[in-house]
């Protein structure tokens, strides 16, 4: 009888007879530049970086479902992946880790206190050959670090459970409809802020038993609290620090939402970045404390490139007039547009990446570029509350306005194209 019981236990515990579930693995690596380098996001800077507020990170979360299908979320403290880096990383990740482009989601926190990357918004920065060389060197290192951290996450794959929930945090303000910014504190006090916002905080929690192994969180807001010369992940960096401190051994990853027209306001003080970061961390912690929805171990990944047509350039006379001032970013942009037209190399369309994942019954949409908030609100209205919309994903090439924003004009729908080129 004892032998029979032992045989039954062995059979029942055999891996081939246990229902397969999720596997997940997480890893992170410090990507803070080791030398002074030009910083990304603002064209008005006059000097390179001069220190570190807190480290910049590249983090990876690898997922594998019950059928062995894999996907990897890569979160970086950068302004945004450029077309050059995205193309290179797709090729290298496929070769090194057998991951197809649809299985790879590369997020950028859109921090404006990170380094300029290869091919990123060169027109707005006063770059010379030496500065570009340092940018190229750093970008090569970044690629290597991303390859390595992805490999480490895949190596760490182990049985887990995945859960999803949604919190709320209210510091994001529609920057188009609440000006001047100096009036924001009064508007907040009077509950008189205007314009669409998305204050949802989507959370994906990865558990090893009762222990939190990794957590991905999102929020639709520009990472522009800070504008000085020290590296940081802005408010989202402080959120990750707080979460990882509260959950030793866990890896926290930020997946930004459609915050192209949303700012953290008021801003420009480290104390505010820290405050917003802790507000967001508190929202994530509240979700973790509640009953979350378990996600079934089914994973599908899709990626489609859509040819978006460019609008018309300004008239030749306007370009020529602007090009006379090479010390201004619009002048540098105009000169480059003239050269592209003259050589017949002016593109008519841009290959825009749209990505769709199903993680259990969670629909996860990721969009390239800086996407305005209307998109996430509409997608969640159309597809339901279990819809997660990520922006600044894979290739950040321009602002992505809606028809409303285009009609209204302004920076997001018009003049920003000269910034992105």
Language model: regions and residue ranges:
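Sec-dependent signal peptide recognition
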Residues: 2-9
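N-terminal signal peptide c-region/cleavage motif recognized by signal peptidases
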Residues: 14-16
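Conserved beta-alpha junction segments in alpha/beta enzyme cores
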Residues: 20-107, 111-251, 257-259, 268-275, ...
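A short acidic (Asp/Glu
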Residues: 264-266
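Anionic-ligand-binding alpha/beta catalytic cores of soluble enzymes and soluble regulatory domains
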Residues: 280-281
């Amino acid at each position: 009888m004892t032998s029979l019981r032992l045989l039954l236990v062995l059979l029942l515990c055999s891996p081939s007879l246990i229902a397969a579930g999720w596997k997940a693995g997480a890893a992170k690596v410090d990507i803070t530049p080791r030398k002074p380098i030009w910083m990304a996001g603002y064209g008005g800077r006059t000097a390179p970086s001069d220190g570190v507020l807190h480290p910049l990170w590249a983090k990876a979360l690898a997922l594998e479902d019950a059928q062995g299908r894999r996907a990897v979320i890569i979160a970086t403290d950068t302004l945004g992946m450029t077309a050059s880096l995205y193309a290179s990383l797709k090729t290298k990740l496929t070769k090194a880790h057998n991951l197809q482009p649809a299985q790879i989601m590369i997020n950028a926190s859109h921090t404006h206190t990170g380094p300029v990357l290869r091919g990123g918004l060169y027109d707005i920065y006063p770059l010379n050959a030496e500065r570009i060389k340092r940018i190229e060197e750093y970008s090569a290192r970044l690629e290597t670090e991303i390859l390595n951290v992805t490999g480490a996450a895949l190596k760490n794959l182990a049985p887990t459970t995945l859960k999803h929930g949604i919190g709320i945090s209210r510091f994001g303000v529609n920057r188009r409809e609440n000006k001047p910014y100096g009036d924001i504190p009064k508007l907040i006090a009077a509950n008189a802020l205007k314009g669409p916002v998305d204050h949802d905080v989507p959370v994906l929690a990865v558990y090893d038993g009762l222990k939190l192994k990794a957590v991905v969180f999102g929020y639709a807001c520009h990472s522009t609290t800070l504008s000085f010369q020290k590296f940081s992940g802005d408010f989202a960096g402080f959120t990750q620090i707080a979460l990882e401190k509260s959950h030793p051994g866990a890896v926290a990853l930020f997946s930004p939402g459609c915050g192209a027209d949303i700012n953290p306001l008021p801003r420009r003080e480290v104390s505010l970045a820290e405050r917003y970061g802790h507000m967001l961390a508190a929202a994530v912690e509240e979700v973790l404390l509640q009953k979350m929805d378990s996600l079934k171990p089914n994973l599908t990944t899709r990626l489609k490139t859509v040819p978006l047509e460019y609008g018309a350039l300004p008239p030749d006379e306007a370009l020529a007039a602007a090009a006379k001032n090479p010390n201004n970013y619009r002048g540098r942009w105009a000169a480059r547009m003239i050269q592209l037209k003259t050589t017949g190399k002016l593109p008519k369309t841009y290959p825009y990446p749209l990505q769709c994942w199903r993680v259990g019954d969670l629909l996860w949409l990721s969009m390239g570029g800086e996407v305005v908030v209307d998109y996430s609100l509409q997608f969640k209205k159309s597809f339901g509350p279990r819809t997660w919309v990520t922006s600044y994903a894979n290739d950040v090439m321009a602002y992505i306005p809606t028809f409303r924003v285009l009609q209204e004009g302004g920076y997001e729908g018009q003049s920003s194209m000269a910034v992105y080129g």
